[in-house]
């Protein structure tokens, strides 16, 4: 309701950790949803039954919106979980490799997506549009945004603003490969600041 506890705290937006269907082989391997295996479906792990995942996620979004709270979801488009369908479909097309043909590991997960490839760009864009158009998600936080790169992130902003001009976008500006260029500051993206984080930790 509009008098919900979160609203009474002054909260006007919430961010959900990854809720796209993820790899969950055993409780011991739990990783908070950061091993996606389907970019187009809400995780059945959070639903009362697999068949109701989309319906119940829609109800969740509607409830937050009714209370005046925007919903941002954390998305992971830099690597893939197990089973790795993209690896099995076309390893060289979807996954990044080095000069010896080995999978690169700048995500720390062993199978970076090749975000410069047009099919990967289309997959990411189609997925994001799906979440906005079908679930009315208000924004996205991009895990290890550096691996998506400036070009793809800029295209994401352009395409999503055509659908929802007030879309909220922010990203981690780093990966184990490096950092996003300073020109990201001229885009509509907000960026996580590791410097602010470390400064805060130093005084807590």
Regions found by a protein language model. Give the residues of each.
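Catalytic domains of carbohydrate-active enzymes, especially glycoside hydrolases
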Residues: 2-25, 134
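Surface-exposed amphipathic alpha-helices with a cationic face
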Residues: 4-7, 58-67, 157-162
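Conserved, mostly hydrophobic/aromatic
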Residues: 6, 16, 39, 64, ...
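Short, well-ordered coil/turn segments that N-cap beta-strands
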Residues: 10-12, 67-69, 74, 136-138, ...
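Short, solvent-exposed turn/loop segments enriched in Gly/Ser/Thr/Pro and often Arg
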Residues: 16-26, 75-84, 144-149, 172-176
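Aromatic- and acidic-residue-enriched carbohydrate-binding clefts of CAZyme catalytic domains
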Residues: 22-66, 81-134
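Active-site-proximal helices and loops of the catalytic beta/alpha 8
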Residues: 34, 127, 144-204
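Glycine- and acidic
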Residues: 113, 137-142
């Amino acid at each position: 309701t509009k008098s919900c506890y979160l609203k009474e705290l002054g909260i006007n937006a919430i961010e959900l950790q990854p809720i796209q269907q993820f790899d969950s082989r055993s409780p011991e391997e739990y990783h908070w949803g950061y091993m996606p295996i389907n970019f187009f479906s809400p995780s059945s792990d959070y639903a009362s039954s697999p068949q109701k995942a989309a319906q119940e996620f829609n109800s969740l979004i509607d409830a937050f919106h009714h209370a005046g709270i925007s919903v941002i979801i954390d998305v992971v488009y830099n690597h893939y979980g197990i089973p790795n369908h993209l690896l099995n479909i076309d390893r060289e097309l979807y996954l990044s490799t080095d000069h010896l043909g080995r999978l690169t590991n700048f995500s720390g997960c062993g199978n970076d997506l090749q975000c410069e490839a047009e099919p990967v760009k289309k997959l990411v864009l189609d997925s994001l549009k799906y979440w906005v158009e079908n679930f009315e998600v208000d924004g996205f936080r991009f895990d290890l945004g550096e691996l998506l790169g400036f070009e793809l992130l800029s295209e994401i902003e352009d395409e999503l603003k055509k659908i929802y001009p007030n879309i909220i976008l922010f990203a981690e500006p780093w990966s184990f490969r490096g950092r996003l260029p300073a020109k990201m500051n001229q885009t509509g993206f907000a960026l996580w600041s590791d410097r602010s984080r470390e400064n805060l930790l130093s005084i807590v």
